[in-house]
Each structure stands twice: as structure tokens, then as C-alpha cells.
């Protein structure tokens, strides 16, 4: 089975969030089921610079404002996976963030940049590469939302049955919204600009295009698949998603054990397993405290936070709960960037409690590994969370997750309540209500359990025994593909 994945990020070449981890890990995981995956990406500088021994597949005349368009085929470095790269310098050759300028303002022509991505995917689905034609095209998030639309448009124009499409929502809150006036530049049928298409409250939505035109929709956890069908989390698209509930699947993301594995992680102070976790984590914790300038206290409960600093991630709650942690002798290490006001608040807290709180603004993949290995608790207090990968990394490293009961967090973490401790299923700390009071109670439970060393070790062992690799999830996605291929024959 041949599957083309269409996305804007791919770890380790280009990453701004968890999307890159998923698009990197899923193709090799699917290979175990006989799926021949290839990936299509925009020619951002990171991709152009990373790929070697590329071959020119085709040159395409000017389109979507790009004067020169070359499609290259190469191997993703250090893998057997093929990658198509759209080299269109006038659209993609820009430094820094792939979506926004140095002032963090989204590029005004993003609609053209990602229209080209979708249009090229449709052409590949029709045989642009004479040696490889996909049976399924799987697009990821709003950047690739037009992929199913262009494939459907081609089917309508030619009268020929098109390949089947799958669209994955990694985060419904980011919808790729543009003024209605840009539609004429997208080269799509006029009938697509309607409620039954791209139109979304007087704008054009790339996310809605993917949700409406794809044959099947997946999102990244069973709970999130339910949540996005109701008003509170549907971001205005709950009606469409509820109508398509029979085509909507919630499939948990997984962890790539080649990258996130305390037994062989070269980025952390020392390697450890579930049998050597006590001494291993103690060394990682000390190294982290030294690196971040915290007091070197082995018995201080260390809370790690690796996140984008946005309101979605529940950082406003955490700010209110800082005193609860420091007053009990706990420590905090935070890595992240985003909202400038939040950055300033956390930096001020680190200055005030310099031996208890350390903050590093920015994103550093290596430091993320060190924080997760060296912390006792990893905090993910998100207001909403489609899946979340950080808590899965925490389980893998024996760093107990403290999470809000929402989305994939609810699907993956079991609270250390008395009954769950008694039956040996607890893996972390879960708070139900999105409030400072509820978060504070979870923090207090973490301190209480930490003081009961035997129980803490049992929960940590259970956490590390959780199966969070891609094996099960890849099989579920393969079954979706398989049913679509059968349906199309």
C-alpha cells in the first residue's frame, strides 16, 4: 500500500510543535504493516538544506505567485523514507519561523504558500511521479487542509475516481483562516466557496476544507474526537464534525522509542531503565539543578514544564499555583516561549525565587530531554489538549505527569487516587476542573505521594510500564487506510 503524507513539519529537520514528532514517527511505524510511505513538504530552508542527493522530479510553470517551482525527490536523512520537497524560493525561502516573520506576524501570503502544497499533493496523486502513485493521501493540519479539496476538484473535473484521502486534526484551534477575497487565487471550483466547502463565517478556512472534503478524518485521541463535536471545543466546526461522526476516528499519538528512551538517550546525564530509575533519575536531577542554577537538593520535588507559553496550555493557572510549590520546598524548571506577557511573569518569578525556579525562554530539543529526565513531575495543565506528547514522554522516563483531565491527557494518565493506588493502576496526577483550586489540590497530592516513597516508586514503575509507542496506533491507522482502499476498488 502506497501512502503520501502531506505536512509542513518533520522532526528533526523542522519542528515548532508536536506535529513534527508525529509526521516523523508515523511513516516508519506504518512500514511494519507493509505501508510504503512518502512525505511531501514545502521547501522551507530547513528542508532544502537538510536533504542530500536530491533528484529533480519536475519543473512546474509559475503558479500561486511562485515564479520558479521545482519538485525534488530525496531520502529523509538517516531513514529509508522518500521525501518530495517543493522548491519555490519566492514562497518558501524565508528565514526563521516557517509561518511568521521576525515580529511573529503570520505571512500575508500563507494562503498561497499552502495552496501550492495542496495543489502539488493532488498532482502527485494523479501520477506526477511516473514511478510512484499513492493509493491514499494523508494530510496533516490546516497547512495541508486544501489537499482533499484539490483532489476532489480534480475528480469532479475529470470524472475519474480519485485516490482516497485522510485528514488529521492535530489542533482544531489553528484553522488557517483568510479573507474571503483570496478564494479566487486558489484555483478551486466556485461551488467550493459555500457552507459545504471552505466558507467559514465570512472567511476561507483551510481546516474546514480538510474536514469537509476528506474521505476520513482522524484526530489524535479518542476523547478529543468527542470534545470537538460539541460547542465548548468545536471552535465553530462542531456541527460539521458531528455530521461526520461516522467518518471521525480518535487515534492516540505515540512515542518514537528511537528518540525518547531513557535506556539509550544520549542527551541526558545518565541512562536508566525501570530497574535503575531511582539512581538514574537522581543523577539526571542533580545535573539539571546544576545546569539551571537551582539549589542542589535531592529531596526537593522538581516540577518540569516544557510547553508553548500560551493561554491554551494553562499557564495562567500555573502562575497562581507557583507559591504552592515553592512554599512546600518544591522546584520548577520551565522551558518554552510564546506570549511575551507570560514570559515576563515567569522570568520575574525565576528572579524572585532564583534557587527554586529556573526559566529558559525558547525551545531547545536537547534541553527538553534533560528536563523530562531530571524532573520528578512533568506538568501539562492545558485548558484543552488534543493529545499531548509531553505526558507520554514523562511516562516513558518515570516522570509522573500532572495533567488536566481533557483530550488525550484524560486518555493517557490515571490519577493517584486511593482506589487507583490500591489496584496498581495510577500513573500520575489528574485534576478535573480547570481552576487554580483544582490544580492546587493535584499539586498537594503530588507532594503527599512524594513523601510516601514506597507508593511513589510503585506509581513510577507503573508509569514506565505503559505501552505508549506507535505500534497499536499505527495498526488502527492502517485499518482505516485498508478499508478505504477496499472501498475504492
UniProtKB/Swiss-Prot annotation:
Keywords: Glycogen biosynthesis, Glycosyltransferase, Transferase. Signal peptide: none annotated. It is an enzyme of class 2 (transferase). GO terms for molecular function: alpha-1,4-glucan glucosyltransferase (ADP-glucose donor) activity; alpha-1,4-glucan glucosyltransferase (UDP-glucose donor) activity. It catalyses: [(1->4)-alpha-D-glucosyl](n) + ADP-alpha-D-glucose = [(1->4)-alpha-D-glucosyl](n+1) + ADP + H(+). Its EC number is 2.4.1.21. GO terms for cellular component: cytosol. The keyword Signal does not apply. Pathway: Glycan biosynthesis; glycogen biosynthesis. It comes from the Bacteria. GO terms for biological process: glycogen biosynthetic process. ADP-alpha-D-glucose binds at residue 15. Belongs to the glycosyltransferase 1 family. Bacterial/plant glycogen synthase subfamily. Synthesizes alpha-1,4-glucan chains using ADP-glucose. This is Glycogen synthase. It comes from Francisella tularensis subsp. holarctica (strain LVS). The gene is glgA.
Amino acid at each position: 500500500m502506497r501512502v503520501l503524507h502531506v505536512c509542513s513539519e518533520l522532526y528533526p529537520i523542522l519542528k515548532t510543535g508536536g506535529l513534527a514528532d508525529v509526521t516523523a514517527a508515523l511513516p516508519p511505524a506504518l512500514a511494519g504493516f507493509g505501508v510504503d510511505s512518502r512525505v511531501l513538504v514545502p521547501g522551507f530552508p530547513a528542508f532544502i538544506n537538510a536533504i542530500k542527493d536530491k533528484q529533480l522530479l519536475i519543473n512546474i510553470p509559475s503558479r500561486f505567485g511562485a515564479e520558479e517551482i521545482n519538485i525534488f525527490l530525496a531520502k529523509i536523512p538517516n531513514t529509508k523514507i522518500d521525501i518530495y520537497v517543493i522548491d519555490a524560493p519566492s514562497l518558501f525561502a524565508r528565514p526563521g519561523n516557517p509561518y511568521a516573520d521576525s515580529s511573529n506576524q503570520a505571512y500575508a501570503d500563507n494562503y498561497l504558500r499552502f495552496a501550492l502544497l495542496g495543489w502539488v499533493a493532488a498532482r502527485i496523486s494523479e501520477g506526477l511521479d511516473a514511478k510512484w502513485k499513492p493509493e491514499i493521501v494523508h494530510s496533516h493540519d490546516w497547512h495541508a487542509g486544501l489537499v482533499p479539496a484539490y483532489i476532489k476538484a480534480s475528480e469532479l473535473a475529470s470524472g475519474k475516481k480519485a485516490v482516497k484521502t485522510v485528514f488529521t486534526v492535530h489542533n482544531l484551534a489553528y484553522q488557517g483562516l483568510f479573507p474571503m477575497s483570496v478564494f479566487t487565487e486558489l484555483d478551486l471550483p466556485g461551488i467550493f466557496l459555500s457552507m459545504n466547502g471552505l466558507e467559514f463565517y465570512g472567511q476561507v478556512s483551510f481546516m474546514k476544507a480538510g474536514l469537509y472534503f476528506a474521505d476520513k478524518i482522524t484526530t489524535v485521541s479518542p476523547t478529543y474526537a468527542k470534545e470537538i463535536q460539541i460547542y465548548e471545543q468545536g471552535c465553530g466546526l462542531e456541527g460539521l464534525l458531528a455530521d461526520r461522526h461516522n467518518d471521525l476516528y480518535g487515534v492516540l499519538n505515540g512515542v518514537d522509542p528511537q528518540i525518547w528512551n531513557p535506556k539509550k538517550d544520549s542527551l541526558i546525564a545518565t541512562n536508566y531503565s525501570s530497574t535503575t530509575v531511582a539512581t538514574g533519575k537522581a543523577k539526571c536531577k542533580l545535573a539539571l539543578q546544576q545546569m539551571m542554577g537551582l539549589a542542589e537538593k535531592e529531596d526537593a520535588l522538581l516540577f518540569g514544564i516544557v510547553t508553548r507559553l500560551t493561554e491554551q496550555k494553562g499557564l495562567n493557572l500555573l502562575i497562581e499555583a507557583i507559591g504552592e510549590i515553592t512554599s512546600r520546598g518544591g522546584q520548577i524548571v520551565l522551558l518554552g516561549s510564546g506570549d511575551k506577557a507570560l514570559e515576563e511573569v515567569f522570568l520575574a518569578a525565576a528572579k524572585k525565587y532564583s534557587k527554586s525556579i529556573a526559566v529558559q525562554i525558547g525551545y531547545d530539543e536537547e534541553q527538553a530531554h534533560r528536563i523530562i529526565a531530571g524532573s520528578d513531575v512533568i506538568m501539562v495543565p492545558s485548558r484543552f489538549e488534543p493529545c499531548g506528547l509531553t505526558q507520554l514522554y514523562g511516562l516513558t522516563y518515570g516522570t509522573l505527569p500532572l495533567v488536566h483531565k481533557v483530550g488525550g491527557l484524560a486518555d493517557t494518565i490515571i490519577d493517584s487516587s486511593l482506589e487507583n493506588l490500591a489496584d496498581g493502576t495510577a500513573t500520575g496526577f489528574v485534576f478535573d476542573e480547570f481552576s487554580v483550586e483544582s490544580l492546587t489540590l493535584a499539586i498537594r497530592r503530588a507532594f503527599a505521594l512524594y513523601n510516601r516513597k514506597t507508593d511513589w516508586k510503585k506509581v513510577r514503575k507503573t508509569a514506565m510500564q505503559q505501552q505508549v509507542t506507535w505500534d497499536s496506533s499505527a495498526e488502527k491507522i492502517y485499518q482505516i487506510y485498508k478499508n478505504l482502499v477496499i472501498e475504492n476498488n
